[in-house]
Every structure is written in structure tokens, then in C-alpha cells.
């Protein structure tokens, strides 16, 4: 294969509850993830034996490079790849742009390098890159628990959303570290839709 074009979608957290901080430093959460039609564009091109990233907005320690190198090393792939990344998803807005780019890179390279690996195994690899990267491997609206890797497909009718993107940037890590844990009514995947309708949270 000489070239493969991919679209990496953004996500919305329709509900996000940070449940508690874990002993491993991560946080347990309860959330509802859905994809929206806002995309980064990724192109994979044949390269000799190295991995090269060309990006529209340079990002230090890009997760796309980590994903590509990880897959190459795990499967002892001899071929290289040139990755062109054009960013449209705003950074540090909670839209999962970096995680989506990583997942799309893993999915694309599976096909590009003709690797025999299931979605489930690919999701386990994805988890080493970030807690919400596995969600983008499956690419369906899902209720997420644990770090975000315990996913249950959620029946949710397509809706339209209006996004407001303030100039303020907030890192996910800092936001989670400042979360306060106070008693509140628990929202679950069973009652989310009705609670949303009555604006109870």
C-alpha cells in the first residue's frame, strides 16, 4: 500500500463524573462519550524503514509518533511510514484530538502494515497511550468507567451540538488533579437520558 487517508473524529463528554483518585495515580470516572463531525486529517505514506511525522501544528512529544513507534516495535515491522497530520480539532478543549489521532494511527497502520490484530487487542495497546484512546478504537457512543477504558455501547440518538471554544486552555491532567469529591446524586447509564431531560445534574 502506497498511501492511506484517515479522518480522526473529535468526541464530546456528554456527562463526566470524576469518581475518585486511585492508588496508581489515575482517576476512576463515569462518562458518556460520543463522536462528533469535527476531524483531524491523517495521511499515511510509504517510507523506507523509518517513521516520520509531518504536522500542521508542531506538538511536543506527539502521541501519533508514540503510537506508530509502539506498533512498529511490538510487531517488529520492517517498513517505515510517513505520517502527515493536519489538525482541525482544538487542543486542550476536552475534545480528545490527540487520543483520536493516536487511535486512528493505530487503526490505519494495522491496515497499512497488514497486521493481524483484533480491535480488542488494539484497544489494549491503545490504553498504554491514554485512558480514552480505546474509545476511539471502537468508535461508537459508549458509557465509560474505570479510567475510561471500560466501555459499554450506549444507544443514543444523533443530536446536533453547538460548541463554544474559549481562549482558555485546560490540560486534562490538571483538571483531574483539581477535582473535588463531594456527595451528589449518582448519574448512571440507566438513568442518564431521563436525568438529562429534567436537568437534574
Locate each region found by the language model.
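Conserved, helical-rich catalytic subdomain that frames metal- and/or nucleotide-binding sites
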Residues: 136-138, 143-201
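ATP-binding N-lobe of GHMP and related small-molecule kinases
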Residues: 1-93, 111, 115-120, 155-156, ...
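DPxDG-like acidic metal-binding loop motif
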Residues: 93-123, 135
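Short, glycine/charged-enriched secondary-structure capping and boundary segments
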Residues: 29-30, 99-100, 177-179
Amino acid at each position: 500500500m502506497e498511501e492511506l487517508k484517515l479522518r480522526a473524529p473529535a468526541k464530546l463528554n456528554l456527562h463526566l463524573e470524576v469518581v475518585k483518585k486511585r492508588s496508581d495515580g489515575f482517576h476512576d470516572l463515569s462518562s458518556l462519550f460520543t463522536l462528533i463531525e469535527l476531524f483531524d486529517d491523517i495521511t499515511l505514506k510509504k517510507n523506507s524503514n523509518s517513521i516520520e511525522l509531518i504536522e500542521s501544528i508542531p506538538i511536543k512529544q506527539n502521541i501519533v509518533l508514540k503510537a506508530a513507534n509502539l506498533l512498529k516495535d511490538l510487531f517488529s515491522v520492517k517498513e517505515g511510514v510517513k505520517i502527515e497530520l493536519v489538525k482541525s480539532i482544538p487542543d486542550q478543549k476536552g475534545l480528545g484530538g490527540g487520543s483520536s489521532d493516536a487511535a486512528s494511527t493505530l487503526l490505519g497502520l494495522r491496515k497499512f502494515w497488514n497486521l493481524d490484530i483484533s480491535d480488542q487487542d488494539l484497544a489494549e495497546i491503545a490504553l498504554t497511550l491514554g485512558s480514552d484512546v480505546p474509545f476511539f478504537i471502537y468508535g461508537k457512543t459508549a458509557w465509560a468507567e474505570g479510567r475510561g477504558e471500560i466501555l459499554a455501547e450506549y444507544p443514543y440518538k444523533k443530536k446536533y451540538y453547538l460548541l463554544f471554544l474559549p481562549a482558555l486552555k485546560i490540560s486534562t491532567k490538571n483538571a483531574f488533579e483539581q477535582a473535588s469529591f463531594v456527595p451528589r446524586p449518582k448519574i448512571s447509564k440507566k438513568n442518564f437520558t431521563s436525568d438529562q431531560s429534567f436537568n437534574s445534574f
